[in-house]
Amino acid sequence: MSTINYDLTRIKALAFDVDGVLSANVIPLHPSGEPMRTVNVKDGYAIQLAVKKGLRIAIITGGRSDVVRKRFIGLGVSDLYFGSAVKIHDYRGFRDKYGLTDEEILYMGDDVPDMEVMRECGLPCCPKDAVPEVKAIEIGRAHV
């Protein structure tokens, strides 16, 4: 077990990338050519529970999948930033919309497009298979 050197009681919002964070790193293709996503049921349970507990949740992704959008809407997430070319802009919009400070936001990303947000948020986290550049920034790392 690892220790996160951060006062978790300060966290009021969670923001996530999708591909590689809330879905597998491998995206199978449907015969039609459309990418198919897999999701973790436990992640979904945790997200809907966080929403019920009053945490603000944002999804900030470069992807544009309607299926993924429906999944998060079904979990109670209303702050969805799809097709995010420069994630820091959407992160700041989310933060400012709710009058949050960077220190009140946990962000989980796994790849280079997430790095700018991870440098700005209060608690940058990543999955264990994140790229090395992201691992150099993170404070908390998932063990799965």
Where are these regions (language model features)?
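Short beta->alpha linker loops
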Residues: 42, 63-64, 86, 110, ...
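Substrate-recognition element of Asp-dependent hydrolases with the DxDx(T/V) motif
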Residues: 47-71, 81-82, 118
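Short beta-strand/loop segments at the ligand-binding rim of alpha/beta enzyme cores
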Residues: 53-58, 97-105, 122-123
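Short hydrophobic/aromatic-enriched beta-strand-loop microsegments
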Residues: 77-85, 124-128
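Conserved Lys-Pro-Asp/Glu-containing loop-to-beta segment of HAD-superfamily phosphomonoesterases
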Residues: 88-115
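Acidic, Mg2+-coordinating phosphoryl-transfer loop and its flanking beta/alpha structural elements
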Residues: 106-140
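Conserved small/polar residues in nucleotide/adenosyl-binding loops
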Residues: 142-144
